[in-house]
């Protein structure tokens, strides 16, 4: 994860607990960038970045990005490792290995899925 590039819409995502979860991962990433919204998922699918972390999403915010990322071989889950299609807290990763590193960091801040 220390070589990962992480994107998010903005650093103060969702609630205070969401922000703390984001920081738990961001503090381990090589590079963190903000402000690209759904374009981050396109960058992930294209192999340009490694990780996207968001919170407070609606179903319509994430369903199309899930299709794009998964078609490119990436993974999209909620912060508990379950389905993300209803929105809420979402993590998208380029690989299963990276997801396996990220989920334990997010777990203390994960809320029940929608």
Predicted regions and their residues:
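An extended, acidic
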Residues: 1-114
